[in-house]
């Protein structure tokens, strides 16, 4: 997923779904800064602690509704979503992209999930996948 963002190292990247922090760590090696939004406070605290202990100082982990992104830090040079959205990516995320930047997100359409890269109004289906669903609303 990180490779699909085609980063050059100067970007601020948004990650939706921190989980353990592994993908945020990978992104931190490819981007200038990573803002990672995790719905579950316990996961966010643990991932944030681990990332700091391991020296990933360019990662900021927040608790929140990832479908809303982090508009206070937008625009982003790439957005990676690690949970499946239904039919389309959340509009708020697309609005937070820099022109020419990519959003990579698993999408469920018609009972099938695919990893899709969205860029400048176009979409590219990459592969079939299976992710947890994207949960919206206040954590």
Which ranges hold each PLM region?
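Extended, well-structured beta-strand/loop surface patches
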Residues: 139
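Conserved histidine-centered catalytic loops in small-molecule metabolism enzymes
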Residues: 123-136
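SAM-dependent Rossmann-like transferase core, predominantly class I methyltransferases
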Residues: 2-4
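Conserved nucleotide-cofactor-binding alpha/beta core module
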Residues: 6-125
